[in-house]
Amino acid sequence: MTDLAARLAANADDIADTLVSLLPRAEIDGVRCAEARLLDAMHYGSEGGKRLRAFLAVETATVFGTDRGHALRVGAALECIHAYSLVHDDLPSMDDDALRRGRPTTHIAFDEATAILAGDALQTMAFTILASDATHENPFIRCELVTCLARASGARGMVGGQMIDIEAEKADSPLSLTEISRLQRMKTGALIEVSCSMGAILGQASAESRRAVEYYARDFGLAFQIRDDLLDAIGDVAAVGKAVAKDADAGKATFVDLLGIDGPIARKLITGCSWG
């Protein structure tokens, strides 16, 4: 295992522990509460994964000398948003996926209505975490964290990107490279970019440092999506942990369609993602 892989795994364990401590529990004094099924689904939908967004936030915050406990809370909030997006993305009305992270998706493991509510609750949980003074003693920093995450995950970010993706499936012609780049910057890249940005905010980084972090994260987000498209095109279910070839079956335009398996633009983006 490389040093990076080891750090990613260690951070994933820390984030998992943080989420367990922050998400509401289904039992109160040993008795399951009336909404226990919802709470079980919240925990289920937020389990597993690489915790990449949390890792980016924690590592960026560490660069700027932030308390790790504060950074882990920000990472947990990001993972709540990411988990909610996956739970909803897997629904029959969206991608209709039955497998996520190597096990049944939340609406399969529970039911569709519970999955919708679990996603809703995970979304609001993210902002509950960020608004707490346990995340940072400075209310202005907490407010900026909330604002940045709301913007990145909303209509001009992740959710807007999902809408463009849905509309693209019904379009008469495939998206251009410019259009698909914008789609993916919103749908996938916005949350990756804000992960780094929130780490810098937590560390009270200078404006210049924040810009540098955001430029890095922007291209990293596109490179990450290119990798995801490659896995969908040439990966296998056992390795990826979810259904593959779904994009091609749905007629979606991807970076692989436009650039090929070894496109030069993809290589440029991937090799350009460095702190230097």
Please place each PLM-identified region on the residue numbering:
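Mg2+-dependent prenyl diphosphate-binding active-site environment of isoprenoid biosynthetic enzymes
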Residues: 20, 28-276
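N-terminal amphipathic/basic leader segments beginning at the initiator methionine
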Residues: 1-26
